[in-house]
């Protein structure tokens, strides 16, 4: 029997998707634009990083070749990868976190999420009125589209004075609630989010997100690691449910449990920051038994650097991840499969602060598996189906496994 390890570099797109124009994202390229900025010296930051983007281990697996495939080009002739590589398009109608992860796990999202308009106020009066009444709140602040760090800096002090939570949204299907961990209370914030989750179901909102923070002034406010996502359950069983139904474990690292509304996730291991998440993933690799799936999300790429349009920070985070990749590769044993991918793009050079509609990389390795191109995949769901095949699980309805190509190339 086999084991599988699935690492999602949150938002690490490799070039605009065929339907990117529908999202206003034609030309977006998270990886390409970061690499270009680094090569031009525009991502140098004293004490952080300098020079061209340095990702030798992902490049060895085939990152550049995957980006070429995403762009419709042939990979560089003569390139000999140390693993397999390809690019995948998204079939889901959105470019959000749940859609990307659910599709990776074999279930594209066929319906349109609900969204709140970019107006002030953004939320329907009926929704906010019910939230205030049912959660016993003195009111709410913000009620608009906003960057989380900006809106906390702007309204955090008023929140502490008044006890009103900060409620905001974005171009994603989200209702976010920020509150101070001690002045408002972490458990109280979670309770308010549970109420909001129930109320926004009528609006087809994908996630309610608790955004706790600490500090006493606009200069010192800082979000903590106690974020919690309250997601709609996937519309049908995912790869995770198939693993669980077979009596095996799904170890979710980071926010995986929240993204799947804890359906099919048998164990959750939380950590703060990409490097701590990497430590947790390595620990789970050590603990994984035959037939288990370790599913990790590395959120900092998206939340700290993509949305904040921080090119140097994103580049440094990629380089830090790449430096540690040999630790994961070194833990692979006969029968193991490791896949690196992403759930969408978030080009830090792009206009605005939101996700970008992009193809994502598929990079992977495993003892005895073939090396080279798996080509352009027409759905992220091919990743989940490949893992299902590898773990000898029943096939799903949406993706096409490429495991046979890895075993018989």
Curated annotation (Swiss-Prot):
The gene is deoB. Its cofactor is Mn(2+). Disulfide bonds: none annotated. Keywords: Cytoplasm, Isomerase, Manganese, Metal-binding. One of its GO terms (cellular component) is cytosol. This is Phosphopentomutase. Gene3D superfamilies: Alkaline Phosphatase, subunit A, Phosphopentomutase. Binds 2 manganese ions. It is found in: Cytoplasm. It catalyses: 2-deoxy-alpha-D-ribose 1-phosphate = 2-deoxy-D-ribose 5-phosphate; alpha-D-ribose 1-phosphate = D-ribose 5-phosphate. Pathway: Carbohydrate degradation; 2-deoxy-D-ribose 1-phosphate degradation; D-glyceraldehyde 3-phosphate and acetaldehyde from 2-deoxy-alpha-D-ribose 1-phosphate: step 1/2. Its EC number is 5.4.2.7.
């Amino acid at each position: 029997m086999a084991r599988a390890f699935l690492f999602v570099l949150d938002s690490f797109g490799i070039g605009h998707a065929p339907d990117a124009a529908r999202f206003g994202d034609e030309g977006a390229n998270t990886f390409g634009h970061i690499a270009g900025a680094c090569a031009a010296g525009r991502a140098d930051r004293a004490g952080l990083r300098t020079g061209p983007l340095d990702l030798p281990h992902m490049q060895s697996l085939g990152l550049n070749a995957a980006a070429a495939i995403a762009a419709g080009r042939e990979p560089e002739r003569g390139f000999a990868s140390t693993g397999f590589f390809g690019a995948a398009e998204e079939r889901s109608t959105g470019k959000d976190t749940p859609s990307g992860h659910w599709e990776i796990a074999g279930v594209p999202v066929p319906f349109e999420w609900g969204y709140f308009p970019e107006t002030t106020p953004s939320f329907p009066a009926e929704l906010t009125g019910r939230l205030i009444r049912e959660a016993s709140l003195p009111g709410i602040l913000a009620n608009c589209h906003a960057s989380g760090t900006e809106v906390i800096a702007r309204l955090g002090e008023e929140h502490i004075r008044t006890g009103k939570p900060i409620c905001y949204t974005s171009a994603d299907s989200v209702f976010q609630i920020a509150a101070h961990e001690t002045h408002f209370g972490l458990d109280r914030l979670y309770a308010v989010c549970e109420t909001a989750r129930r109320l926004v179901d009528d609006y087809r909102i994908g996630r309610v997100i608790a955004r706790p923070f600490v500090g006493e002034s606009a200069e010192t406010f800082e979000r903590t690691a106690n974020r919690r996502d309250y997601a709609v359950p996937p519309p049908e069983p995912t790869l995770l449910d198939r693993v669980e139904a077979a009596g095996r474990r799904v170890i979710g690292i980071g926010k995986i449990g929240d993204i799947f509304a804890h359906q099919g996730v048998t164990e959750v291991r939380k950590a703060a920051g990409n490097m701590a998440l990497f430590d947790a993933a390595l620990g789970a690799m050590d603990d994984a038994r035959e037939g288990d799936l370790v599913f990790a999300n590395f959120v900092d790429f998206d939340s700290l650097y993509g949305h904040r349009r921080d090119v140097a920070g994103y580049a440094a985070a990629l380089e830090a991840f790449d430096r540690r990749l040999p630790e994961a590769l070194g833990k692979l044993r006969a029968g193991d499969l490791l896949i690196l991918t992403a759930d969408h793009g978030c080009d830090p050079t792009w206009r605005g602060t939101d996700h970008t509609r992009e193809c994502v990389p598929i990079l992977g390795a495993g003892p005895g598996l073939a090396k080279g191109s798996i080509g352009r995949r027409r759905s992220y769901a091919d990743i989940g189906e490949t893992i299902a095949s590898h773990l000898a699980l029943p096939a799903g309805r949406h993706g096409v496994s490429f495991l046979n190509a890895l075993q018989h190339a």
